[in-house]
Each structure stands twice: as structure tokens, then as C-alpha cells.
């Protein structure tokens, strides 16, 4: 068995792909932070197979495989899909197989590059903890993001490196049985489905994405609208003046609740940015201070008290600086 020193304890089952790269067919690990290898013996990993990290073992009968041990000096792992919290895919991976992360119930983050063009059905089934996708790609370029979002109906925070940050809200899809004919009618609840349609040929259409804010407001999903707004304003990639004004208006009306949530969670960077926009009233800041005190978030409280002091300073405008 080939043994490679790295930062993880992994047991890999691999094969040669038709393109000449390496197909990673199975990865067994107990690690919470998993970085799949970019290459093995100088050959790039180009395929991530079906059920590769899932709870279920893939059927590899009849395949010509070889084993690779990735180690940082520990013992050989016994696979535990529930232990996995973050996964970084190989930088040259072109495809992710069906059910790749099936039943990885505690998976919170996936990191991948724009080389991935295929994202298999069921790849994120039962990944109920997934919250973040980091995509190393240009925000305006075609990527696998539409396929990935199509596999996950929950709320997702998506980052294109440092170039753009977006929130895709959740939605719920259900089939209603129209008895006695037993005709099933598809019903979709939540604005997240509309946000997932904002793509042209695999590339995100930012104009459509920003226009989808109106549906959130019509649905009175104000807390979600505030979270969408603060992300777009923080990293304003191709943000029009009109869309910027709409997002600022949302935060003037509903930013107070967001500030309280950030204060309770101790998210000082988010609080500092929100304060810098000048959208919070004195009452909003006071309420956030109360939330920080109750949660014993002293750093967040310090940020808020400093801002409250600035708003009360004689002759100072009600705005905040980073």
C-alpha cells in the first residue's frame, strides 16, 4: 500500500480514470476536517466517486483498484461519516459522484474549485448541517453551483473566494396527493427556489439575484432579507446603485434584529460592518447591547458601546466607521 504523509488520517481506494487521472472511489476517515489529496504520485485526482465519504460503502466489485494510506502519524481510521464537518475537494476534480456525502449529517462546509463541472444526484442527501460553500472561481464564470444548489434545499452561505458572498435561502418542496384521482401536485414554499434559478448557462446572474429580494419582502421573510442584504453590501460584486439602495433600505427597517443575532453570537466583525453602514437606530444599538450582555459576549458589547458613544457625541453624524 502506498503511504503518504499529510495532515489527515485517510484510507483511500483509487483507480485510474479513463482520462488518465486518478478516480477517488472511497475515502475512510474519522477526521472532522477532511482535505482530499490533489494528486497521488504526481497524478492529479480528477474524479470523486459515488458514495466516496458516505455512510454507505460503494460497490467496487470488478473494479481495478489500489489502496493509498494518507497519514499524519496516527492509527488507521475506521470510517465515521458523522465525524466529518468540512471537506475540501481536489483542486483538479472534474466530477463528484452520486451520493458522495450521503448521510454525512454533520457536514457543515464544502470547498471546491471551478474545475468541477458535474455534481451527482443525491450527493448532499441528509447533509442537514451544511451551511457554507467556498468556491474558488470567478463570480461571473460558469460553475457547478447550480447543480450543487439543486441538491440542497437548505440555506447556504456561498463565497467566491473574496470576490463575492451570497446567501441562498432555503425552500421546501412537497407533493400533494389530490385524491381520489391520486394526481400529485408539486408545491414549493419559500423564496429559496427562485434564488436558485438566477443562473445563465451555469453562471450566476447577479441582476436576477438582486431582483429576487422583492420576493423575500413579499413573503415577509425579513430576517432572511437582512442576511442577504448584509452579504451583498459587504462584498458588492457588480452591485448596482439601485440594488444597493434596496439593500440599505432593508437594513434600516430590519437590521436591528440582525444586530441582536450577531451580538448574541459574538460576531464582532459582522457587527462592526453593520454599524459602519449607518443603518441602525440608537434603539437598535441599545437592544443589541442587551443581547450581548445576556449572552456574556463582552467583545461584541464593547463594539456596540463604542458605537453608542459615537452616536451620542455632540456634533457627530449618526454614522460609523470601520
Spell out what each predicted region is:
Residues 283-322:
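Alpha-helical oligomerization segments
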Residues 125-126, 147-150, 297-299:
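Short low-complexity, flexible loop/linker segments enriched in glycine and/or proline
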Residues 2-22, 28-46, 57-95, 105-118, ...:
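Structural signature of tandem-repeat unit edges
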Residues 49, 98, 267-275, 297-306:
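Ankyrin repeat structural motif
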Amino acid at each position: 500500500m502506498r503511504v503518504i504523509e499529510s495532515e489527515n488520517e485517510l484510507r483511500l481506494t483509487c483507480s485510474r480514470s479513463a482520462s488518465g487521472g486518478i478516480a477517488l472511489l472511497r475515502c475512510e476517515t474519522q477526521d472532522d476536517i477532511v482535505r482530499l489529496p490533489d494528486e497521488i504520485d504526481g497524478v492529479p485526482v480528477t474524479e470523486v466517486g459515488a458514495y466516496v465519504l458516505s455512510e454507505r460503502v460503494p460497490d467496487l466489485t470488478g473494479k481495478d483498484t489500489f489502496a493509498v494510506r494518507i497519514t499524519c502519524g496516527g492509527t488507521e481510521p475506521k470510517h465515521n461519516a458523522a465525524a466529518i464537518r468540512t471537506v475540501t475537494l481536489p483542486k483538479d476534480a472534474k466530477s463528484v459522484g452520486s451520493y458522495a456525502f450521503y448521510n454525512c449529517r454533520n457536514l457543515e462546509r464544502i470547498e471546491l474549485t471551478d474545475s468541477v463541472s458535474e455534481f451527482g444526484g443525491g450527493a448532499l442527501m441528509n447533509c442537514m448541517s451544511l451551511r457554507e460553500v467556498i468556491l474558488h472561481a470567478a463570480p461571473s464564470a460558469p460553475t457547478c453551483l447550480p447543480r450543487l444548489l439543486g441538491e440542497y434545499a437548505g440555506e447556504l452561505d456561498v463565497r467566491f473566494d473574496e470576490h463575492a458572498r451570497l446567501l441562498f435561502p432555503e425552500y421546501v418542496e412537497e407533493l400533494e396527493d389530490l385524491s381520489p384521482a391520486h394526481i400529485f401536485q408539486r408545491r414549493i414554499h419559500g423564496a429559496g427556489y427562485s434564488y436558485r434559478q438566477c443562473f445563465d448557462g451555469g453562471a450566476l446572474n447577479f441582476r436576477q439575484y438582486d431582483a429576487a429580494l422583492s420576493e423575500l419582502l413579499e413573503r415577509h421573510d425579513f430576517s432572511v432579507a437582512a442576511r442577504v442584504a448584509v452579504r451583498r453590501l459587504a462584498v458588492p460584486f457588480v452591485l448596482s446603485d439601485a440594488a444597493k439602495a434596496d439593500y440599505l433600505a432593508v437594513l434600516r427597517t430590519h437590521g436591528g434584529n440582525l444586530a441582536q443575532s450577531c451580538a448574541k453570537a459574538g460576531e464582532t466583525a459582522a457587527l462592526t460592518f453593520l454599524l459602519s453602514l449607518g443603518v441602525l437606530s440608537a434603539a437598535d444599538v441599545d437592544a443589541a447591547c442587551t443581547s450581548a450582555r445576556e449572552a456574556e459576549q463582552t467583545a461584541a458589547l464593547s463594539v456596540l458601546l463604542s458605537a453608542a458613544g459615537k452616536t451620542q457625541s455632540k456634533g457627530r453624524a449618526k454614522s460609523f466607521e470601520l
